[in-house]
């Protein structure tokens, strides 16, 4: 028994080292095509979340791996049949893919082996899990504006900082850090929550979006925020409360991923081995900070709803492709700053700009210990100076990040470059035309779903207690995550 525990510990340390020095956190988003059909979206959700036989799934995965390897080898061999530069580039790309495939399989094998001997936290069965504080969505989907329909929008914002972030009990998001944890060392600007509430003036209900300057947020934390204002949500006919983050790598860790890996490796292992309550496990969340986040976000949602007023909505797209890059070829990304501009009837009130863009907030580097809102902080300053409120919704980013070459100055720090980058995008937004009028039509639908975790590294990390996400055991797979998916239509040709 002692020998088994010793082996487990050695393998665990190896894994922590591999993960700490070879991994960075990534976020994946998805956007629906404009005018997408709700029924098709629902069908895709059903297919995504359907439970499949584990052996069949395993065979399919193996075949996919084999086919991918064969395709890569073909590319490499094909490069020798021509001296064409494009083919040579394909050869180098193929070699890189083969290398990363091999490393990925090595890490995956280590994690699978470790999971068999490492004491992991217990999970409830999927059948016993109950979703709470769910979004209900619109009672009907309308394809034209109702008689007398008008856009009504409200805005509010508040700081998420408590003043205690440098006390040594908080962690910074971004890349994993081992053996030394990433405690914040300086506060460079602000981390905020920005909220807008909107309706089309009908009884179809109010939709709320709260966007946090944060590394990430688990679904259970989203539902906790909703629970704080459950009565208000019901009384105000709020049919959807959406809470997302801008995924700043320089924000306080609200997802849990960047906790002290030594405490996870040793402390959580012991607690899991003796069956202690999972709530006692260590992760990167600071309880006082999270409580402040819950309360502040809930209060800001209430304020935004109470600030709603009638006006007109406009939509514009501004091409900023020279300021965006994909870190992985081919270069594929949305080149636009997609803006909804609400202009209130009351000219004494400020317009509200809602901007969707897919640009990673990693200006200070993935390993920074400085706290900053990154480039969105500086965009907001430009927009505020022009007399408007600002909310940014992060798009499908993953490896898509900022192209700072046009604004970079030799000798500047990364923070100064992030400032210049944000200022530039802000200036472009301020100069943009307000766009075309959007009909007052607002439809939204939601579904609670379970998503299978097929990344063994993430599965293992979650099972140590490092992540704040809830997870359940399923019949044919070892872990599924309870989450939710939504689909929204604005006007006659916009969908999110």
Give each language-model segment a name.
Residues 1-5:
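Positively charged n-region of N-terminal signal peptides that target proteins for export
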Residues 425:
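Anionic-ligand-binding alpha/beta catalytic cores of soluble enzymes and soluble regulatory domains
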Residues 35-54, 75:
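N-terminal, intrinsically disordered, polar/charged segments of Gram-positive cell-envelope systems
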Residues 7-25:
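Sec-dependent N-terminal signal peptides of Gram-positive bacterial secreted proteins and lipoproteins
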Residues 20-41:
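Sec-dependent signal peptide cleavage junction
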Residues 61-244, 248-420, 433, 440-496:
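Conserved beta-alpha junction segments in alpha/beta enzyme cores
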């Amino acid at each position: 028994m002692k020998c088994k525990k010793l082996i487990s510990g050695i393998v665990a340390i190896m894994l922590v080292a591999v993960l700490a020095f070879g991994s960075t956190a990534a976020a994946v988003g998805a956007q629906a095509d404009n005018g997408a059909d709700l029924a098709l979206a629902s069908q895709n959700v059903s297919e995504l979340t359907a439970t499949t036989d584990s052996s069949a799934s395993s065979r399919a995965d193996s075949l996919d791996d084999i086919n991918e390897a064969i395709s890569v080898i073909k590319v490499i061999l094909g490069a020798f049949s021509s001296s064409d530069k494009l083919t040579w580039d394909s050869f180098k790309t193929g070699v890189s893919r083969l290398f990363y495939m091999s490393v990925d399989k090595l890490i995956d094998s280590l994690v699978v082996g470790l999971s068999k001997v490492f004491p992991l936290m217990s999970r409830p069965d999927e059948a016993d899990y109950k979703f709470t504080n769910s979004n209900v969505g619109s009672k009907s989907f309308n394809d034209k504006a109702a008689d007398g329909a008008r856009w009504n929008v409200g805005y509010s914002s508040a700081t998420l900082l408590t003043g205690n972030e440098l006390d040594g009990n908080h962690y910074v998001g971004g890349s994993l850090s081992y053996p030394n944890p990433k405690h914040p060392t300086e506060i460079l600007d602000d981390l905020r929550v920005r909220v807008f509430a909107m309706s089309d003036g009908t009884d179809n209900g109010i939709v709320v979006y709260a966007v946090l300057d944060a590394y990430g947020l688990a679904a259970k934390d989203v539902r906790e925020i909703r629970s704080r204002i459950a009565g208000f949500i019901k009384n105000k006919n709020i049919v959807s409360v959406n809470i997302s983050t801008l995924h700043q790598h320089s924000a306080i860790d609200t997802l849990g991923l960047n906790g002290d890996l030594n405490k996870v490796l040793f402390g959580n292992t012991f607690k899991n081995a003796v069956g202690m309550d999972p709530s006692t496990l260590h992760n990167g969340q600071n309880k006082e900070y999270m409580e402040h986040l819950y309360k502040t976000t809930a209060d800001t949602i209430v304020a935004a709803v109470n600030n709603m007023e009638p006006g007109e909505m406009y939509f514009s797209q501004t091409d900023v492709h020279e300021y965006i890059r994909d870190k992985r070829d081919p270069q594929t990304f949305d080149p636009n700053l997609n803006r909804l501009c609400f202009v209130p009837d009351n000219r004494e009130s400020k317009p509200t700009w809602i901007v969707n863009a897919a640009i990673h907030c990693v200006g200070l580097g993935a390993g920074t210990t400085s706290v900053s809102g990154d480039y969105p902080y500086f965009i907001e300053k430009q927009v505020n100076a022009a007399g408007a409120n600002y909310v940014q919704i992060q798009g499908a980013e993953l490896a898509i990040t900022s192209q700072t070459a046009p604004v970079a100055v030799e000798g500047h720090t990364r923070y100064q470059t992030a400032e210049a980058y944000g200022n530039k995008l802000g200036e472009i937004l301020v100069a943009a035309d307000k766009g075309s009028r959007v009909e007052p039509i607002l439809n939204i639908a939601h579904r609670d779903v379970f998503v299978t975790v097929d990344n063994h590294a993430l599965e293992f990390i979650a099972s140590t207690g490092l992540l704040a996400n809830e997870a359940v055991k399923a019949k044919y797979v070892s872990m599924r995550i309870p989450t939710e998916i939504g689909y929204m239509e604005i006007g006659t040709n916009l969908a999110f």
